[in-house]
């Protein structure tokens, strides 16, 4: 086998990167057919790579054996106030013929990210079904932080205790809103987010969402009190479930919370059934969602509801 050569990523490698990414996505779709088919075409895959390469601060590396390009890795920057001084390897930001070569690519690219760009927080979105690739990332110091999930939408009946929210529910929804962020901020997640919006700004945002007929905002009531809520919207509105992770015509389950005192009572299951019923009524066939892997409740609840992991967000922080 020819020796591996690592070079900086440049435009001359875009077509090769598209071919590698298309092959990766084809293998991914063999494990999860609900993912979008079009990125099995090298030209479509190359467009995703090019979009990353044109992003501010993009940099990376390619791997060659002889004259053949056998891997690439691209990193971009996102908002520091959310992610810290960061570099992201996005959905279309990497593909290799041999998983071990990913480690060499990362070693080359990360030298710039850390030593020159001073960006020590690294994130990578990796196909969950490719165990060898996930393992290669783990052997350069990455661990699981977040999971994307997908499933077919099952036929379901509306539970009596769940209904669509109306503007009259806004105060109850405001009271419920901190439940998720409070839970995520605790052990073992320790999530950090943006400062909370003021109540008036959040009220206006909720009312705007409730007026949007493309959305499904569900509430679960017990004894006249809203104890849980799910929010659904077209997946096209999501910046997370995009590109290779967004099936055509999918619905996003984008927010979900139940009060701590009703967990285990069936409220979450009832809301899930109502979410399926609403989505089927709207003509959707596929649902996507995501969760923090370290969130013990979510990481058990969503797979138990039939969601299969599609991508894992891996994370490494270099002190």
Regions flagged by a language model, labelled:
Residues 1-42, 159-198:
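Short amphipathic alpha-helix that is part of the acyltransferase structural core
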Residues 22-106, 222, 227-249:
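Conserved donor-binding loop and adjoining core beta-sheet/short helix segment
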Residues 59, 119-120, 285:
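Short acidic/polar active-site loop segments enriched in Thr and Asp
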Residues 98-112, 255-258, 264-277, 281, ...:
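Conserved acetyl-CoA-binding loop-helix of GNAT-fold acetyltransferases
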Residues 122-125, 253, 287-291:
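Conserved hydrophobic beta-strand within the GNAT/NAT acetyltransferase core sheet
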Residues 132-135, 235-243, 297-300:
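A short, acidic/glycine-rich surface segment
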Residues 209-219, 223-255, 259-269:
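Intrinsically disordered, low-complexity segments enriched in Gly and acidic/Ser/Thr residues
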């Amino acid at each position: 086998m020819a020796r591996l050569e690592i070079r900086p990523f440049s435009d001359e490698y875009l077509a090769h990167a598209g071919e590698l990414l298309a092959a990766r996505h084809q293998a991914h779709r063999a494990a999860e057919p609900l993912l979008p088919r079009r990125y099995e075409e090298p030209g479509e895959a190359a467009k995703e790579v090019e979009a990353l390469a044109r992003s501010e601060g993009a940099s990376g590396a390619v791997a060659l054996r002889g004259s053949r390009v056998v891997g690439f890795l691209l990193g971009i920057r996102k908002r520091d106030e959310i992610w810290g001084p960061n570099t992201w390897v996005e959905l279309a930001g990497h593909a290799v013929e041999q998983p071990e070569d990913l480690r060499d690519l990362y070693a080359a690219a990360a030298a710039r990210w850390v030593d020159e760009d001073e960006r020590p927080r690294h994130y990578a979105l990796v196909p969950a079904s490719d165990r060898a690739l996930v393992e290669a990332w783990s052997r350069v110091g990455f661990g699981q932080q977040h999971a994307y999930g997908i499933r077919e939408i099952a036929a379901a009946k509306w539970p009596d205790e769940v209904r669509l929210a109306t503007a009259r529910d806004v105060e109850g929804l405001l009271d419920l809103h901190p439940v998720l962020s409070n839970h995520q901020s605790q052990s073992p997640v320790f999530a950090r987010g943006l400062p909370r919006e003021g109540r008036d700004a959040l009220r206006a945002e909720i009312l705007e969402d409730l007026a949007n007929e493309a959305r499904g905002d569900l509430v679960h009531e017990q004894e006249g009190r809203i104890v849980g809520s799910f929010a659904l919207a077209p997946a096209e509105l999501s910046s997370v479930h995009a590109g290779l992770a967004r099936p055509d015509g999918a619905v996003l389950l984008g927010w979900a919370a139940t009060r701590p005192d009703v967990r285990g009572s069936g409220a979450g299951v009832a809301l899930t059934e109502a979410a399926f019923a609403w989505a089927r009524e709207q003509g959707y066939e596929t649902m996507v969602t995501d969760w923090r892997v370290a969130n013990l409740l979510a990481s058990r609840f969503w797979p138990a509801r039939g969601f299969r992991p599609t991508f894992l967000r891996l994370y490494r922080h270099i002190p």
